[in-house]
Amino acid sequence: MAGGDGMLRRLLRLHRTEIAVAIDSAFPLLHALADHDVVPEDKFQETLRLKEKEGCPQAFHALLSWLLTRDSGAILDFWRILFKDYNLERYSRLHSILDGFPKDVDLNQSRKGRKPLAGPKAAVLPPRPPTKRKALEEPRATPPATLASKSVSSPGSHLKTKPPKKPDGNLESQHLPLGNGIQTMAASVQRAVTVASGDVPGTRGAVEGILIQQVFESGRSKKCIQVGGEFYTPNKFEDPSGNLKNKARSGSSLKPVVRAKGAQVTIPGRDEQKVGQQCGVPPLPSLPSEPQVNQKNEDECAVCHDGGELICCDGCPRAFHLACLSPPLQEIPSGLWRCSCCLQGRVQQNLSQPEVSRPPELPAETPILVGLRSASEKTRGPSRELKASSDAAVTYVNLLAPHPAAPLLEPSALCPLLSAGNEGRPGPAPSARCSVCGDGTEVLRCAHCAAAFHWRCHFPTAAARPGTNLRCKSCSADSTPTPGTPGEAVPTSGPRPAPGLAKVGDDSASHDPVLHRDDLESLLNEHSFDGILQWAIQSMSRPLAETPPFSS
């Protein structure tokens, strides 16, 4: 055994410079040495200060020189920690040292040359992982089978519990990514735990997690619960004797509350019990013996898991970098600020609440223009009409809102609105076709019904097109024109009603020709809806000579 101890000391002296050059970061090697009591607290702080002044290789070279003066047990522990998986992943140059390590040297031998520490310092040391595991099992003395078979009934819902998963005993270590890609969990400290929702008021369903031990970037080693891909750290599993030591290293206090993506669960049995549901994740129940929580925001970004200048959410413990937000912020906003998860959770919570029954409302009255009323709306029943004065620019009629399936305007009502161009004159419509010959070249628009037609097809005996106010054969027949002058049928004396303005109480509107689908689509593409409304308002301002007065 003595020969093996001397061999380890000689190997450390031989590879001291190589190890110091391979260590380019104090974490996780230095923190692991402090956690396993290989490096005391004062030497830990001294190495960190030296790293800031001279660099990491020089600081570790001085630490290894000091370690050569220690007993053989400390050197054995150093080699064990150095060749752990997370150190080999973090420091790739250590593989060459491991490959050249003598095969006959056993690093698993027991430590006999090191005396256990006694006195007050021994009380400050954190217990070994097996002791922690035993402490974890004591609060949950109920067997998993009993918890799984236990059913809790709540009003309006039936809860089901899942059987606990079997712990995987062949997993020695599990590596989890942090901001720098390093996060480790101790081996053989995983156990499936199923908690019924009835144990904690305000929770729904059963939450199943795995108790694990986690080593964080700051060097702290704590118990946490794994639920899916998330890890939550209850304050109960923190060792009280090790908090002072961990606080001195990390410079920040531990988070004592169990967090499940924004959900907070306080201690059952207190006067105030609050359960915050955010992001739609069910809250994780806390243990009955958990101490009073002290709400604080996290000291790392919830997106990239890195520190720095963070903006804290006022609705949950999360914190974010301004650049990690979506969309990113340029500066910290003033007043209260909530993250997208809190806002989404509020919307989902409002939608999940039952709506208060309201008395049935009367059908809304929709004011529409008189000139835009279709023929089908006139036969739906009596309507309340306002008495219009002679100098009114626009006349409105209050109609009961029609059925959603019924269109407000029919193609026959849109024909006169879309017939005029920018100058109020009919023009050629390339996409429309004549109703007689079916040809779409050089077609004209009727000034009354906006139907596409050829002059030669509707009036083959006419010599030329008189005027610009052209009408098709059907519209000219209604107004009794002469075949040679169909566009002059409208009298010029007296006020002329707007084309397409439906008369109140007149049933002749149902005889308006219906546009084909191609004609209607072409008209809608050529004219905007604002132009249609503007035309309607201008047309409605003209006095209606043929319209009877409205009844009061």
Swiss-Prot record:
Q: Kindly state the positions of the motif LXXLL motif 3 in this protein.
A: 414-418
Biological process annotations from GO: central tolerance induction to self antigen; humoral immune response; negative thymic T cell selection; peripheral T cell tolerance induction; positive regulation of chemokine production; positive regulation of DNA-templated transcription; positive regulation of transcription by RNA polymerase II; regulation of thymocyte migration
Which keywords label this protein? Answer: Activator, Cytoplasm, DNA-binding, Metal-binding, Nucleus, Phosphoprotein, Repeat, Transcription, Transcription regulation, Zinc, Zinc-finger
Claim: Hydrolase is one of the keywords in the record: no
Report the locations given in the UniProt record: Nucleus; Cytoplasm
Residues in domain SAND? 182-282
The segments labelled Disordered in the record are 109-177, 472-514
Q: Does the keyword Ribosomal protein apply?
A: no
Disruption phenotype annotation: Deficient mice show an altered thymic organization with altered morphology and location of mTECs. They exhibit defective accumulation of thymic dendritic cells in the medullary region and generation of naturally ocurring T cells in the thymus.
The PHD-type zinc-finger regions cover: 298-345, 434-475
Which tissues does it occur in? Highly expressed in a few cells in the medulla of the thymus (medullary epithelial cells) (at protein level). Expressed in thymic but no peripheral B-cells. In secondary lymphoid organs, expressed in a discrete population of bone marrow-derived toleregenic antigen presenting cells (APCs) called extrathymic AIRE expressing cells (eTAC)(at protein level). Detected at very low levels in thymus, lymph node, liver, brain, ovary, lung, testis, kidney, heart, spleen, bone marrow, skeletal muscle and adrenal gland.
Give TM regions. Answer: none
Task: Show the PANTHER family listed in the entry.
Answer: NUCLEAR BODY PROTEIN SP140, NUCLEAR BODY PROTEIN SP140-LIKE PROTEIN
For this entry, the protein name equals Autoimmune regulator
Name the source organism. Answer: Mus musculus
Organism lineage string: Eukaryota, Metazoa, Chordata, Craniata, Vertebrata
